[in-house]
């Protein structure tokens, strides 16, 4: 028999290599997968396996089942039989010889310890008894000597003072009695201590003996509990309870009539009682054809005194009913606990993991959070990455305020004209470019500066190594400049400041330094860490110094990445191309991305069918810090998602589908959560006007930025609702959705196709195209302003002073007035002021001048005024006439 490798032997035996290695280890032979196995080693392994096969089982389980019948009296004198089945199961574990020897040694040591403790206790008791006897003898001698001296003294003083002698004797007797009592108590305490010591030693020995007997290998099953006496015992308990109840009732009746004390109940199993007599009489009646029985049963279950704390396993989402089942409580208790925490839910509602954890911990249970992404972790861990890290190019993000010259600066570096291609001259999505310089390669990310693109700038700061903060020398620090500083600090990346537009006459770079120093950006000449470079994107001055500063900062950072192996990176931007499908701009962080790789990207997956660089040229691979556009994904990924190359497309699809389902569950759980503080907002929701919008844009980042900006415009009276959003042109489905929801169709750098235009014309939908985000936001603001209810404002048009008061049978009190300001008009609302305090507000009913009804009276003229439903007009009052005007409100 020739030697074979362990792998070949495993294949021959049809077992795994790891299993065979373990079997060799159990047989005392250490082998690895590539080692050879000799014939002698095979014989050793075979003998070991045979020994394991013939050895008896390690466990022996005995099961016993007993059945009995219990008769229970029912209503109407009828009884019913209940079948009772008692199942018992006992498992005996076989001990190995070493374990048996160890237990025997422990038992022997326990017996020796017990014997030693008993001997020590006896010796201690003897010593204490001897010491006690000696103390008692000494005390007895002292007492006898004292008594003798007292007797002699008493005989001498007996004649002189009999009364004093009696008192002395009494005191001495009392003292002797107390001493005797103290000695007796001490003796009892010593005996009690000795008795406790012996009992403790005996208890320890008994416990050790019992444990040794339980651990022995024995096939004797435990005795089956005899249930034949069950009915007798139950009936006896019931009779005792009934007798006790009768005694309490009779004792309560007899308290007010000097009743005799109740006699104690008879002890013993066969004690006669009222229940026994009634049961005997019932048996006699039953023999004569009666159907009643006097026996009764009593339930012996007692409610647990304290709550049971359980380990509750909670997944990422769980319903209220499932959570209640895991805690073994009713669903109403869980709902009550959630209401105490401020959340309302139904029993079938899905809640998120954090809420379920709070509820379970509030109810006193221990929470175990279960991770449901084992498959995802397995796919991510099964990646082949190289070990050696090599230097890589820095990723530089250009940030700053809008119109401060970021894209123009990058244009000069790339010697291209990208800014002219941007709508309105402003950047509206991230551009990724890499340029070759004399000192090395640099990858640039150009971010938008408009306020709406906050999330884009945050993404750019997270994916970058160095931030170039562009500040216009004539404009200074602006809001988006401050925001860019905050993003850079949050991402923990160094900042290089490029002071742009230095060629302008009004440029003031020192002011820029002073303003930036207030936000923690200090130049190196002031003792800070940030490099300041004066540049001009138009003239090209300072560009070389800026590139040198970037490369110097990158050299300080010592940027390295693994160049070989499976790639990983981040999505910078994504969009839907009509001819190519979903397109994602990916920045590779480590590894090398090849054409044909299987990538997992957020909720999407796919095989890389094509790769293009920023110039639109086809490339076959992309290393670290290289931005590329990839085609072949199953859908448009979200900007900011992680891109990972995996081995298996099937597993990638499973992970993507799992992520989609998990995202949907968590989203539903958060949507359904309705807290108490939002209850009144939900009640008044029907009174709020809504502007429904269906949004389509060219890239994912623009959709995200526009959605955030529009949702921030919502007020308490008018809310913006994004009914649907997506990347790509406006389709027939989008138009149908807008028609069904009465929404406005908004296209940002996209157009509607022919089928969508037909639906838009037939349904008369409002379709708007935009290429600049400013115009879109302004028009939505105008539409929302039209839905606002107008503001009502009171404007005083006249003031009259009461000079005299007349009585009219038709109108009551008529005020004779002089108009002091403005004009008094009929049927306008008025206020009556007395000492500049409003005492009545109503309507002007009658206005006359020289007994003629007039519509208005001008300043400086007299008139008679009748106030509707008011007669308490006095001389000196002022009558103020006003009108209510409406002012159209706008959204700021």
UniProtKB/Swiss-Prot annotation:
Residues 500-503 are annotated as: G4. Belongs to the TRAFAC class translation factor GTPase superfamily. Classic translation factor GTPase family. IF-2 subfamily. GTP binds at residues 400-407, 446-450, 500-503. Disulfide bonds: none annotated. Residues 88-305 are annotated as: Disordered. The lineage of its organism: Bacteria, Pseudomonadati, Pseudomonadota, Gammaproteobacteria, Enterobacterales. The keyword Kinase does not apply. Residues 536-538 are annotated as: G5. GO terms for molecular function: GTP binding; GTPase activity; guanosine tetraphosphate binding; translation initiation factor activity. Residues 425-429 are annotated as: G2. Keywords: Cytoplasm, GTP-binding, Initiation factor, Nucleotide-binding, Protein biosynthesis. It comes from Salmonella typhimurium (strain LT2 / SGSC1412 / ATCC 700720). This is Translation initiation factor IF-2.
């Amino acid at each position: 028999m020739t030697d074979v490798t362990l792998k070949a032997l495993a294949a021959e035996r049809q077992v795994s290599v790891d299993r065979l290695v373990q079997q060799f280890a159990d047989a005392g032979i250490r082998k690895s997968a590539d080692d050879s196995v000799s014939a002698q080693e095979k014989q050793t392994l075979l003998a070991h396996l045979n020994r394991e096969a013939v050895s008896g089982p390690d466990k022996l389980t005995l099961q016993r089942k007993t059945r009995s019948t219990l008769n229970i009296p029912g209503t109407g004198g009828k009884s019913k039989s209940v079948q009772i089945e008692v199942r018992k199961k006992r498992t005996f574990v076989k001990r190995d010889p070493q374990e048996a020897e160890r237990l025997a040694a422990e038992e022997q040591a326990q017996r020796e310890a017990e014997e030693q403790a008993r001997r020590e206790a006896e010796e201690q008791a003897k010593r204490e008894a001897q010491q006690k006897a000696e103390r008692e003898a000494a005390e007895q001698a002292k007492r006898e000597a004292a008594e003798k001296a007292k007797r002699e003294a008493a005989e001498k003083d007996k004649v002189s003072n009999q009364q004093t002698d009696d008192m002395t004797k009494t005191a001495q007797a009392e003292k002797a009695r107390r001493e005797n009592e103290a000695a007796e108590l001490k003796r009892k305490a010593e005996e009690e201590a000795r008795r406790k010591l012996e009992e403790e030693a005996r208890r320890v020995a008994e416990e050790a003996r019992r444990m040794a007997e339980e651990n022995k290998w024995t096939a004797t099953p435990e005795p089956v509990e005899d249930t034949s006496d069950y009915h007798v015992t139950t009936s006896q308990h019931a009779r005792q309870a009934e007798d006790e109840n009768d005694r309490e009732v009779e004792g309560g009746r007899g308290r007010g009539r000097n009743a005799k004390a109740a006699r104690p109940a008879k002890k013993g199993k066969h004690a006669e009682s009222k229940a026994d007599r009634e049961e005997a009489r019932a048996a006699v009646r039953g023999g004569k054809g009666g159907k009643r029985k006097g026996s009764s049963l009593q339930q012996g279950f007692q409610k647990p005194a304290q709550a049971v704390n359980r380990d509750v396993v909670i997944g990422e989402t769980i319903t209220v009913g499932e959570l209640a089942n895991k805690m073994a409580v009713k669903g109403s208790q869980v709902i009550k606990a959630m209401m105490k925490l401020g959340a309302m839910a139904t029993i079938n509602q899905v809640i998120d993991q954090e809420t379920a954890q709070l509820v379970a911990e509030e109810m006193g249970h221990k929470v175990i959070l279960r991770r449901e992404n084992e498959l995802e972790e397995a796919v991510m861990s099964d990646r082949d990455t190289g070990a050696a890290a090599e230097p890589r190019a820095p990723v530089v993000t250009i940030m700053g305020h809008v119109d401060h010259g970021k894209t123009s600066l990058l244009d000069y570096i790339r010697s291209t004209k990208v800014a002219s291609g941007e709508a309105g001259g402003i950047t509206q999505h991230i551009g990724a470019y890499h340029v070759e310089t004399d000192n090395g390669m640099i990858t640039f990310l150009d971010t938008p500066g408009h306020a709406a693109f906050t999330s884009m700038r945050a993404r750019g700061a997270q994916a970058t190594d160095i931030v170039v903060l562009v500040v216009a020398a004539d404009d200074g620090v602006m809001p988006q400049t401050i925001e860019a500083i905050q993003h850079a600090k949050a991402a923990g990346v160094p900042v290089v400041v490029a002071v742009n537009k230095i060629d302008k006459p009004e440029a003031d770079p020192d002011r820029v330094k002073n303003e930036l120093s207030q936000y923690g950006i200090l130049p190196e000449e002031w003792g800070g860490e940030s490099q300041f470079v004066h540049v001009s994107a138009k003239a090209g001055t300072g560009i070389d110094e800026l590139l040198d500063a970037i490369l110097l900062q990158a050299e300080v950072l010592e940027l390295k990445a693994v160049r070989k192996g499976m790639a990983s990176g981040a999505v910078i931007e994504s969009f839907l191309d009509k001819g190519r499908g979903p397109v994602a701009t990916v920045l590779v962080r480590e590894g090398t991305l090849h054409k044909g790789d299987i990538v997992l990207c957020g909720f999407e997956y796919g095989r890389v069918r094509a790769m293009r660089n920023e110039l639109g040229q086809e490339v076959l691979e992309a290393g670290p810090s290289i931005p590329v556009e990839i085609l072949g994904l199953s859908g448009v990924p979200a900007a900011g998602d992680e891109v990972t190359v995996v081995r298996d497309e099937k597993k990638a699809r499973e992970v993507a589908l799992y992520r989609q389902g998990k995202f949907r569950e968590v989203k539903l759980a958060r949507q359904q959560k309705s807290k108490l503080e939002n209850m009144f907002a939900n009640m008044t929701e029907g009174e709020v006007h809504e502007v429904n919008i269906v949004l389509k844009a060219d890239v994912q980042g623009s959709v995200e930025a526009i959605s955030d900006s529009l949702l921030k415009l919502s007020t308490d009276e008018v809310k913006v609702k994004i009914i649907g959003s997506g990347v790509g042109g406006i389709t027939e489905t989008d138009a149908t959705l807008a028609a069904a929801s009465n929404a406005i169709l908004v296209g940002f750098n996209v157009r509607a196709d022919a089928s969508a235009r037909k639906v838009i014309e037939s349904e008369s939908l409002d379709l708007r195209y935009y290429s600049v985000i400013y115009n879109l936001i302004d028009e939505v603001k105008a539409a929302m302003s039209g839905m606002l209810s107008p503001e009502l404002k009171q404007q005083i048009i006249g003031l009259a002073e009461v000079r005299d008061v007349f009585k009219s049978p038709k109108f009551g009190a008529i005020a004779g007035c002089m108009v002091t300001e403005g004009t008094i008009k009929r049927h306008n609302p008025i206020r009556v002021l007395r000492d500049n305090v409003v005492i009545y507000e109503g309507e002007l009913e009658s206005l006359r001048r020289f007994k003629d009804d007039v519509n208005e009276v001008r300043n400086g003229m007299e008139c008679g005024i009748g106030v509707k439903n008011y007669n308490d007009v006095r001389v000196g009052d002022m009558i103020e006439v006003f009108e209510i005007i409406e002012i159209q409100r706008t959204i700021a």
